[in-house]
UniProtKB/Swiss-Prot annotation:
Annotated positions binding ATP: L51, G52, D53, G54, S55, F56, G57, T58, V59, K72
Family as reported in the entry's similarity comment: Belongs to the protein kinase superfamily. TKL Ser/Thr protein kinase family. SH2 domain-containing protein kinase subfamily.
Classification via CDD domains: SH2_ShkA_ShkC (cd10356), STKc_MAP3K-like (cd13999)
One Gene Ontology biological process: actin cytoskeleton organization
Subcellular localization: Membrane
A GO molecular-function annotation: protein serine kinase activity
UniProt domain SH2: residue ranges: 424-513
Family annotation (InterPro entries): Kinase-like_dom_sf, Prot_kinase_dom, Protein_kinase_ATP_BS, Ser-Thr/Tyr_kinase_cat_dom, Ser/Thr_kinase_AS, Ser/Thr_Kinases-Pseudokinases, SH2, SH2_dom_sf
Phenotype when the gene is knocked out: Cells lack polarity, move very slowly, and exhibit an elevated and temporally extended chemoattractant-mediated activation of the kinase Akt/PKB.
Pfam families in the record: PK_Tyr_Ser-Thr, SH2
Organism (species): Dictyostelium discoideum (Social amoeba)
Main location: membrane
Name listed for the protein in its UniProt record: Dual specificity protein kinase shkA
Length: 527
C-alpha cells in the first residue's frame, strides 16, 4: 500500500513539474511575441559612407550604441506592400542565428520615412572580392567560402517553417576580416511549410534574373531547390572569378536561353571534376535532380580535402577519419596514419600507446621518425591548455614534399628523418630568414628549404661569388627532384651529385632539426 502511495506522489510531482514548464514556455513565447524584434530609435543611429544597395534601400556604414554597424535605410517613398515586405525581413532576421548568417542587431520600424535595419558590419561582399584581380584568393580559400555560404543557406532550409532566400548571389554573401562568409539580404525571402511549393503572383518573379532558376523565371511552381540553382551559379563564379552572363542585355532573350535552350555558363577545363559535377547538379533544369544543401555541404567538404591534399590516398585517409574537420589531434592523427600505412592494426595497441608505454620503442628509429614528422606537421598550441593539432593543409604539404602515400607508405617517415639528418636542411623558413642565416658567410655556404612559392618544391639558397645570396628552385616533376635538367630520387642525392655544378660546399648551420636528431638517444614519449 505504501508503494502505491509513493507512486501516486511521484506522478503528482511529475505532473506539477510539467505544468510549471508549460507555463514557463507559454510565458517565454508570450514575451517574445510582445517584444518582437529589438527596436532601435532613429536618434541612436548615425550613417556614414555608402556600402551598397539592398533589396529595399541603401546600405551604409554607421554607428549605433557605440558600435560600428551596417545600416540598411529604406527608400523614403514606399507603398504599403514594400513596407510589409520590410517588416517581414525584420521579422525573419530577428529569428535566425547562425555563424554564417549576418547577425541582426535591431531595427527602426515605427517612424515613417526612417525605416532602418542594423546588422553587424562586414568587410565587403564576395562578388567584389572575386572580381578584383588584385585580391589573392587561393582555390582552397574560395572553396571554404563556398562551404560557409552553403552552411548558412542549409540553416535557412532546415528551419521549420522553411526559409527560401530567393535572391542568392555573390553580392548577397558578405565577408568578414577572417574571410568567413555570411548570408545577408532577406528582403525577398519567403516562408513555407516543408514539402509545400510556391508560385509568384501577378507582380512577376522576385529576385535578380541572372541568378534565378528556370522555374522562377517562367512563373512556375518552385521550392527551396530554386536556391540550389542559384548556388550553382555562385559556385561557378567562386571558381572562375568571372562576371556572370556578360553577353546578355535583353531579358526575354535571356529567359529563352536559360529555360528553352538550357544555357549555362561554360565551366573551364581546369575545374576539379568533383566541383564541376556539383555545379552541374545544382543548376540542373529539373529541380528534383538538384541536391539538397546538406548534400552540397558534404560534397564541398570532400572537394576542400581534395584541394588541401592532392595525394589520392592522403585524401582518402582524411575523408575516412576527419572529413568534417580542418584539423586533427596529433595523437589521433598518428594512430590513424600508423594503421593506414600498416605500422599497426586492429590487433595491436595504438601507435600513441606504443610510443608512450613500450620500452622497446624508447630511443628507436620509429620513435625518432615520429618526432621528425611531428616537427614539420604539427601546429603549436595557441594557448597553454590547447592540444597539438595537424592541419589538413600541412598534411597535404608534407605528402607533396616527401612522397606518395600509396607507393611509399611508412617509408615517408624514413625520408623525412633522412633529410633532417642533413645539416644543410632548414625546412620551412622564409626567403628573408634564409638570407639572414647566410649573410656574411663564405662563398659556397648553402642551405635547402621548402619553396615558399611552388607546391611540393624545394629551394637552394647559397652565397655566390660576389657575396650576394641567390636562390635556385628544386622542382619535383613526376616524383623526381630536378635542377639543371638533372633528376634524382631524393634531395640528398641531388645535393651530393650537383654540389660542384651549383657551387655549394659548406652547409649553413642553425637548422632546428639537428638538436632533434642528435639528442635521439635521450628521447622518450612524444609529448
Amino acid at each position: 500500500m505504501a508503494t502505491q502511495q509513493q507512486q501516486q506522489q511521484q506522478q503528482q510531482q511529475q505532473q506539477q513539474i510539467k505544468a510549471r514548464k508549460d507555463i514557463q514556455i507559454q510565458q517565454a513565447q508570450s514575451a517574445s511575441d510582445i517584444l518582437g524584434p529589438p527596436e532601435i530609435s532613429e536618434t541612436e543611429i548615425t550613417t556614414e559612407s555608402i556600402l551598397g544597395d539592398g533589396s529595399f534601400g541603401t546600405v551604409y556604414k554607421g554607428r549605433c550604441r557605440l558600435k560600428d554597424v551596417a545600416v540598411k535605410v529604406m527608400l523614403k517613398q514606399v507603398d504599403q506592400k514594400t513596407l510589409t515586405d520590410f517588416r517581414k525581413e525584420v521579422a525573419i532576421m530577428s529569428k535566425i542565428f547562425h555563424p554564417n548568417i549576418v547577425l541582426f542587431l535591431g531595427a527602426c520600424t515605427s517612424t515613417p520615412g526612417k525605416l532602418m535595419i542594423c546588422t553587424e558590419l562586414m568587410k565587403g561582399n564576395l562578388e567584389s572580392l572575386l572580381l578584383d584581380p588584385m585580391v589573392k584568393l587561393p582555390l582552397i580559400t574560395r572553396m571554404r567560402m563556398a562551404k560557409d555560404a552553403a552552411l548558412g543557406v542549409l540553416w535557412l532550409h532546415s528551419s521549420n517553417p522553411v526559409f527560401i532566400h530567393r535572391d542568392l548571389k555573390t553580392s548577397n554573401l558578405l565577408v568578414d576580416a577572417n574571410l568567413t562568409v555570411k548570408v545577408c539580404d532577406f528582403g525577398l525571402s519567403q516562408i513555407k511549410q516543408r514539402g509545400e511549393n510556391l508560385k509568384d503572383g501577378q507582380d512577376g518573379a522576385k529576385g535578380t534574373p541572372l541568378w534565378m532558376a528556370p522555374e522562377v523565371l517562367q512563373g512556375r511552381l518552385f521550392n527551396e531547390k530554386a536556391d540550389v540553382y542559384s548556388f550553382g551559379l555562385v559556385l561557378w563564379q567562386i571558381f572562375t572569378r568571372q562576371e556572370l552572363f556578360p553577353e546578355f542585355d535583353n531579358f526575354f532573350k535571356f529567359v529563352a536561353a536559360i529555360c528553352e535552350k538550357q544555357l549555362r555558363p561554360s565551366i573551364p577545363d581546369d575545374c576539379p571534376k568533383s566541383l564541376k559535377e556539383l555545379i552541374q547538379k545544382c543548376w540542373d533544369p529539373n529541380p528534383e535532380v538538384r541536391p539538397s544543401f546538406e548534400g552540397i555541404v558534404s560534397e564541398l567538404e570532400e572537394i576542400i580535402i581534395d584541394c588541401c591534399i592532392p595525394d589520392e590516398y592522403g585524401a582518402i585517409l582524411w575523408k575516412n577519419h576527419f572529413k568534417h574537420e580542418n584539423e586533427a589531434n596529433w595523437k589521433d592523427f598518428i594512430n590513424v596514419f600508423s594503421n593506414f600505412v600498416g605500422l599497426t592494426n586492429a590487433n595491436t595497441p595504438s601507435m600513441s600507446d606504443l610510443l608512450q608505454f613500450s620500452p622497446n620503442l624508447n630511443g628507436s628509429t620509429i620513435e625518432l621518425n615520429f618526432k621528425c614528422l611531428k616537427s614539420i606537421i604539427v601546429s603549436s598550441p595557441k594557448g597553454p591548455h590547447e592540444e597539438e593539432v595537424v592541419l589538413m593543409e600541412q598534411f597535404g604539404k608534407v605528402l607533396a614534399w616527401f612522397g606518395n602515400l600509396k607507393e611509399d607508405g611508412s617509408q615517408i617517415l624514413d625520408k623525412i628523418r633522412q633529410l633532417m639528418e642533413c645539416a644543410w636542411f632548414h625546412g620551412d623558413i622564409s626567403t628573408s630568414e634564409s638570407e639572414n642565416r647566410l649573410r656574411q658567410k663564405p662563398e659556397g655556404t648553402f642551405l635547402v628549404r621548402f619553396s615558399t612559392s611552388e607546391y611540393g618544391a624545394y629551394t637552394i639558397s647559397k652565397v655566390s661569388k660576389n657575396g650576394g645570396i641567390s636562390h635556385q628552385r628544386i622542382h619535383r616533376p613526376q616524383g623526381k627532384f630536378q635542377v639543371n635538367n638533372s633528376k634524382y630520387l631524393s634531395v640528398k642525392e641531388l645535393i651530393t651529385g650537383e654540389a660542384q655544378a651549383l657551387g655549394i660546399n659548406t652547409p649553413c648551420l642553425g637548422s632546428r632539426f639537428l638538436s632533434l636528431i642528435y639528442k635521439a638517444q635521450l628521447s622518450g614519449y612524444i609529448n
